[in-house]
Swiss-Prot record:
<feature type="modified residue" description="N6-(pyridoxal phosphate)lysine">
    <location>
        <position position="708"/>
    </location>
</feature>
<comment type="similarity">
    <text>Belongs to the GcvP family.</text>
</comment>
<comment type="subunit">
    <text>The glycine cleavage system is composed of four proteins: P, T, L and H.</text>
</comment>
<dbReference type="GO" id="GO:0016594">
    <property type="term" value="F:glycine binding"/>
</dbReference>
<dbReference type="Pfam" id="PF02347">
    <property type="entry name" value="GDC-P"/>
</dbReference>
<dbReference type="InterPro" id="IPR020581">
    <property type="entry name" value="GDC_P"/>
</dbReference>
<dbReference type="GO" id="GO:0005960">
    <property type="term" value="C:glycine cleavage complex"/>
</dbReference>
<comment type="function">
    <text>The glycine cleavage system catalyzes the degradation of glycine. The P protein binds the alpha-amino group of glycine through its pyridoxal phosphate cofactor; CO(2) is released and the remaining methylamine moiety is then transferred to the lipoamide cofactor of the H protein.</text>
</comment>
<dbReference type="GO" id="GO:0004375">
    <property type="term" value="F:glycine dehydrogenase (decarboxylating) activity"/>
</dbReference>
<dbReference type="GO" id="GO:0030170">
    <property type="term" value="F:pyridoxal phosphate binding"/>
</dbReference>
<dbReference type="GO" id="GO:0019464">
    <property type="term" value="P:glycine decarboxylation via glycine cleavage system"/>
</dbReference>
<dbReference type="InterPro" id="IPR015422">
    <property type="entry name" value="PyrdxlP-dep_Trfase_small"/>
</dbReference>
<dbReference type="InterPro" id="IPR049315">
    <property type="entry name" value="GDC-P_N"/>
</dbReference>
<dbReference type="Pfam" id="PF21478">
    <property type="entry name" value="GcvP2_C"/>
</dbReference>
<keyword id="KW-0663">Pyridoxal phosphate</keyword>
<dbReference type="InterPro" id="IPR015421">
    <property type="entry name" value="PyrdxlP-dep_Trfase_major"/>
</dbReference>
<keyword id="KW-0560">Oxidoreductase</keyword>
Length: 957
């Protein structure tokens, strides 16, 4: 049969690439669940009153090649000037071996946060290396495995300083006047909700101020001056004031460690260690503190523990500090951080080692000395005598200098009164320095690099002798071994092989949406047009970014039913915080600032109450009924009780129990009736796109997890993006920025992220996804996600009861399997099942959330029926194994479940178990076997014997 050209062109080809089950598989699954079609299934499950009559108009789908060409044309509108702006962002040289083997490798970027350490030892080791780099450079005792960015880390440092302060009545936080402006911006935003007063003054005047609980200093000021704060820190410590220091990671290679000078907390951006600027992110922040404060630290911390065989193994330590356990009492609302970026930085340090890093840092400093000498020789004055890589140059004809810079396609820092700022980096060359001489002095300057190099003293005094590092760094063997590309490639591959990512198997984590991160979506993030822009470059140089962001925002507006989208939050947790701040400021604008009660269902993710607390709200829990739905009577009672103090409700939809609640519109109406706003958590947006929308349901604000629904990969625990969609009345209250005016946003609010558009360089991933799927594909993706979840639920419900269902016994895009009856009957727990799944080659589902003793499964639309059946077969086989325990064939204390996972060495070890080696290690057959490298971890040992730095190589032997 002849096909038309339009049919043969097949613009929707990517839809079939993204969605796992083909048409025949979809029909088989529809038959299995008793539905005639995807539309019929959706019609049964989603409440009629919230179903969209027509899908959002986001255009027709495009092929991978057409979408890439279209985005390339947009990217080409960005102008790549050489940037010397600095302010915490510099150009880098990402080693190609790391680019190819990590950043472009799905074995690294598709993994999940390492909650299951047995399948995460590779990236845990890389993160432990990151912590070791942080410890060596900061001179402190305890380091975290990354925070979202430097400015966020500063806000976390302030919050932590208050938590550990012995000055309980003090309520003021002092910030030195030469911190980066974006850092001050985010600190002020956070301080407002905590009720802290922020004082900004010259650091030497800090002692003039009373009732100060904490101080933030910057070792190398924003205009380049190196400060020796040793005496000041000593005086502050004598007054029991907690001292935080912002530091430059490359400068720390040469400068004395702030921890050695007495600082309590040290943080900064690790961007300079190989991570492109990317118009603001994503980048990992480093964060370190004294050992005595470890239980008050924010973010993930990797610790050394033992496995069941007594072997050294790594895990996330001290999780009881975190939001998923402590909820509103958590140290921070941080969930995902920046694991992929932290690992790039850690491997940059491994590849270069201490010798290589010192060479890079010394070369940057040498070029800065040469530039300084030439400028001074020609009569220009430097504002600071002590510097590392940044000069603040006083110029008489500033306009002329900036005009010459623009003509030469150079960006200088221009916001300093009567001066310009110049920050050099590892990409700076001799030719660049000569070009800078021409810009600042004119073409006839007569200077010569070689002559200046000879003239400049080799014992340069531009770094104070007292500020030069006198201790060794990175002495651990891991930083002194892998310096050839062959060794580095093999080391990275050895780490990758230890982990389980989407390139090996389905990751059925409920509430996490581990869907395909297509290669075509990932390709643009490494394009130089996107990767090399400074976030504070003039807007006319970022027209491509602005067009791409505006187009993506327009699509998200249509998909969410909101009126505006703010792209600044660079994680879901930060999106929650930004959305709640918008609600808070909206109430204040109406003289209703007293509204501070946030209603949160008992089933909510721990980030919700933690974010509400950070936004200065009181959390009141709303009960759920026996079916897992919000108890409307209790909601009405709590709303009535809150009265004029009701600020909002935070609700997830579909619910965290995996069902479309029939009364969601009524929930919104009750809250609105009492003057509150509705925050609809976008964590489960993958079951809404094209079918319904938060705005249509009646919500006022949501964050969107672009790293879930819109295909940004999880990266082993970050990056993420959490933009917020808002109704028009909240649009004036979304985050703004003190350095860059965000076009189209009338907001005057403070920032929540260091960069105006958060992690802008990963936004092309979501742009590509929406462009290639189109309206038709996006709706179908949601429908197939629902089909896949219902297929699993229907196949497993006789073996593992599905805890919550909606109408007709259906679930949404995920289902909760109740393990509690089996545990009572047999003693086998959800943990045992999770670990046994590793032997079958699967990452575990989400354990004990939102209900203890359960497993929550979310297959996503990207998994084929073949993979779903493989998972189902594994679960049914595990159920048969549990029956063997129940029947007494295997004792409860010695069976394949409680001993799981099994490792390769057990094949040749002594064997005294009542089951065979084959049952232990090959339960699903020998084909394509995944081997964990450690047995089940001893969590208690790890927290009782906390050790969070690199261990001797002998420990792994």
């Amino acid at each position: 049969m002849t096909q038309t050209l339009s049919q043969l062109e097949n613009s929707g080809a990517f839809i079939e690439r993204h969605i796992g089950p083909d048409a025949a598989q979809q029909q088989e699954m529809l038959n299995a669940v008793g539905a005639q079609s995807l539309n019929a299934l959706t019609g049964q499950i989603v409440p009629k009153d919230i179903q969209l009559a027509t899908p959002p108009q986001v255009g027709a789908p495009a092929t991978e090649y057409a979408a890439l060409a279209e985005l390339k044309a947009i990217a080409s509108r960005n102008k790549r000037f050489t940037s010397y702006i600095g302010m915490g962002y510099t150009a880098v040289q990402l080693p190609p071996v790391i680019l190819r083997n990590m950043l472009e490798n799905p074995g690294w970027y598709t993994a999940y946060t390492p909650y299951q350490p047995e399948v995460s030892q590779g990236r845990l080791e890389a993160l432990l290396n990151f912590q070791q780099v942080t410890l060596d450079l900061t001179g402190l005792d305890m380091a975290s495995a990354s925070l979202l960015d430097e400015a966020t880390a500063a806000a976390e440092a302030m919050a932590m300083a208050k938590r550990v302060s012995k000055l309980k009545n003090a309520n003021r936080f002092f910030v030195a006047s030469d911190v980066h402006p974006q850092t001050l911006d985010v600190v002020r935003t956070r301080a407002e909700t905590f009720g802290f007063e922020v004082i900004v003054d010259d650091a030497q005047k800090v002692l003039d101020h009373q009732d100060v609980f904490g101080v933030l200093l910057q070792q190398v000021g924003t205009t380049g001056e190196i400060h020796d704060y040793t005496a000041l820190i000593s005086e502050l410590k004598s007054r029991k004031i907690v001292v935080s220091v912002a530091a430059d990671i490359m400068a720390l290679v040469l400068l004395t460690a702030p921890g050695k000078q007495g600082a309590d907390i040290v943080f900064g951006s690790a961007q300079r260690f190989g991570v492109p600027m990317g118009y603001g992110g994503p980048h990992a922040a480093f964060f370190a503190a004294k050992d005595e404060y470890k239980r008050s630290m924010p973010g993930r911390i990797i610790g050394v523990s033992k496995d069941a065989a007594g072997n050294t193994a790594l895990r996330m330590a001290m999780q009881t500090r975190e939001q998923h356990i402590r909820r509103e009492k958590a140290n921070s609302n941080i969930c995902t951080s920046q694991v992929l970026l932290a690992n790039i930085a850690s491997l940059y340090a491994v590849y270069h080692g201490p010798v290589g890093l010192k060479r890079i840092a010394n070369r940057i400093h040498r070029l800065t000395d040469i530039l300084a000498a030439g400028l001074q020789q020609k009569g220009l004055k430097l504002r600071h005598a002590h510097y590392f890589d940044t000069l603040c140059v006083e110029v008489a004809d500033k306009a002329g200098v900036l005009a010459r810079a623009e003509a030469a396609e150079i960006n200088l820092r221009s916001d300093i009164l009567n001066a310009v700022g110049i920050t050099l980096d590892e990409t700076t060359t001799r030719e660049n320095v000569m070009q800078l001489f021409s810009v600042l002095l004119g073409d006839n300057h007569g200077l010569d690099i070689d002559t200046l190099d000879k003239d400049v003293a080799h014992d340069s005094r531009s770094i104070q002798p007292a500020m030069l590092r006198d201790d060794e760094i990175l002495t651990h063997p891991v930083f002194n071994r892998y310096h050839s590309e062959t060794e580095m490639m093999r080391y990275m591959h050895s780490l990758e092989r230890k982990d389980l990512a989407l390139n090996q198997a389905m990751i059925p984590l409920g509430s996490c949406t581990m869907k395909l991160n297509a290669a075509a979506e990932m390709i643009p993030i490494t394009w130089s047009e996107f990767a090399e822009l400074h976030p504070f470059c003039p807007p006319e140089q970022a027209e491509g970014y602005q067009q791409m962001i505006a187009q993506l925002a327009d699509w998200l507006v249509k998909l969410t039913g909101y009126d505006a989208v703010c792209m600044q939050p660079n994680s879901g947790a930060q999106g929650e915080y930004a959305g709640l701040l918008a609600i808070r400021h909206y109430h204040e604008s109406r003289n209703e600032g007293h509204r501070d009660i946030c209603l949160i269902p008992a089933s909510a993710h721990g980030t919700n109450p933690a974010s509400a607390h950070m936004a200065g709200m009181q959390v009141v829990v709303v009960a759920c009924d026996k079916n897992g739905n919000i108890d409307l009577a209790d909601l009405r009672a709590k709303a009535e009780q809150a009265g004029d103090n009701l600020s909002c409700i935070m609700v997830t939809y579909p619910s965290t129990h995996g069902v479309y609640e029939e009364t969601i519109r009524e929930v919104c109406e009750v809250v609105h009736q009492f003057g509150g706003q509705v925050y609809l958590d976008g964590a489960n947006m993958n079951a809404q796109v094209g079918i319904t929308s938060p705005g249509f349901i009646g919500a006022d604000v949501s964050h969107l997890n672009l790293h879930k629904t819109f295909c940004i990969p999880h990266g082993g625990g970050g990056p993420g993006m959490g933009p917020i969609g808002v109704k028009a009345h909240l649009a004036p209250f979304v985050p703004g920025h003190s350095v860059v005016q965000i076009e189209g946003m009338l907001t005057r609010q403070g920032a929540v992220s260091a960069a105006p558009f958060g992690s802008a360089s990963i936004l092309p991933i979501s742009w590509m996804y929406i462009r290639m799927m189109g309206a038709e594909g996006l709706k179908k993706a949601s429908q197939v996600a629902i089909l896949n979840a219902n297929y699993i639920a229907s196949r497993l419900q006789d073996a593992f009861p599905v805890l919550y269902t909606g109408r007709d016994g259906r679930v949404a895009h995920e289902c909760i399997l109740d393990i509690r009856p089996l545990k009572e009957e047999t003693g086998i727990s959800e943990l045992d099942i999770a670990k046994r799944l590793i032997d079958y080659g699967f990452h575990a589902p989400t354990m004990s959330f939102p209900v203890a003793g359960t497993l929550m499964v979310e297959p996503t639309e990207s998994e084929s029926k073949v993979e779903l059946d493989r998972f189902i077969d594994a679960m049914l086989a595990i159920r048969a194994e549990i029956d063997q325990v129940k029947a007494g064939v295997w004792p409860l204390e010695d069976n394949p479940l409680v001993n799981a996972p099994h490792i390769q060495s057990e094949l040749v070890a002594e064997w005294a178990h009542p089951y065979s080696r084959e049952v232990a290690v090959f339960p699903a057959g020998v084909a394509d076997k995944y081997w964990p490298t450690v047995k089940r971890l001893d969590d208690v040992y790890g927290d009782r014997n906390l050790f969070c730095s690199c261990v001797p190589i002998s420990e792994y032997q």
